[in-house]
Amino acid sequence: MVDCDWSNLPEELLHMIVLLLFSVVELKRFRSICRSWRSSTSGVNRNNPFPSRPRIHFDPIDPSETLSSDDSYISRPGAFLSRAAFFRVTLSSSSSKGWMIKSDMDINSGRFRLLNVLSRYPLRLYSESIDLLEFTVSEIREAYTVLNTAKRRSATKGYQRSAPVKVKEGEGHRDGVLGIGRDGNINYWDGNVLSELKQMGDHFSDIIVHKGLINSDLEISRFGTSLDENITDGCWGDLRFVEGCGELYIVERLPKNTRKRKAGDFFHNSRTVGFKAYKMDEELAKWIEIKTLGDNAFLMGTDTCFSVLAHEVYGCLPNSIYYTENTWPKVCKLEDGNGSSIIVTMSESSKSSFEMFYPSFV
């Protein structure tokens, strides 16, 4: 075997490697290898492919230009669009399995902090640093929510679910935010004025930008079709979008107390008894129920949902859905094909099923 001095790689090659990195954490790990690698990224403006994202503040605006006087909560000073990132962490010596962590940045101190993966609540105790030579940290997803203040970790009433968008302005673009309020209406902040998209109606509970297209249930703009009410007989639970392997799914949380879905009835707290999952059949142009998720597990966070491969994450149950209820983490194990499910709340006896959320270094 021929030894290679990795510290003497050509600077041009190092620049090419930097351009292939996809997150700030990857860049920091690259810089930690040795002095020559670190110096190759010293020119921030020229070489740093991850400039800081602009923070979107919902500045106080004239009440006459907001939704209505009753919705003045959204124009409180300090409201802002908060970004969180999800990471897969593996041992550098063995990358076959890993853990999931989530972090955001404290806007007061500028420091990163770890959050509960399924919510926005900070972890109380965790290590102040991670050895990037011992662990490989890869950013896999980001999520956004509108917070009233830096201290408050729950979303504002008008933006229970949020999606940042680019607004065309002349030859350029500026940042805007679409969100769904507790009343099921879609609200829009264009950087200056808050408005309600009344023409869209009031039957929405989630929103997502998927492959560059904005989708919001129950109407899906990409396909121009709604979820077939014949499947659920019009008794809707909490509907969420889930992205997995490039596909878009809808997951319906089934409450114990079923009732006809109506405006203002989207974020109720009835106990969950199961889930149903749907996938778009592009040939039939309709949503169809799927009976099994295979090796996939869906993570239903308060700010975004996505899928992971169970065999790549410690303790993760395949064909299952992880979620929170009254701040408690739970997992719903779907039974293949028969429509039933088993719900487990995290406890000492079931802790291994939630191992992916509690890395050894935390």
Swiss-Prot record:
Stored Gene3D superfamilies: 1.20.1280.50
Transmembrane regions: none
Pfam families membership: Beta-prop_KIB1-4 (PF03478)
InterPro entries assigned: F-box-like_dom_sf, KIB1-4_b-propeller, SCF_F-box_domain
Name of protein: Uncharacterized protein At1g65760
Species, as recorded: Arabidopsis thaliana (Mouse-ear cress)
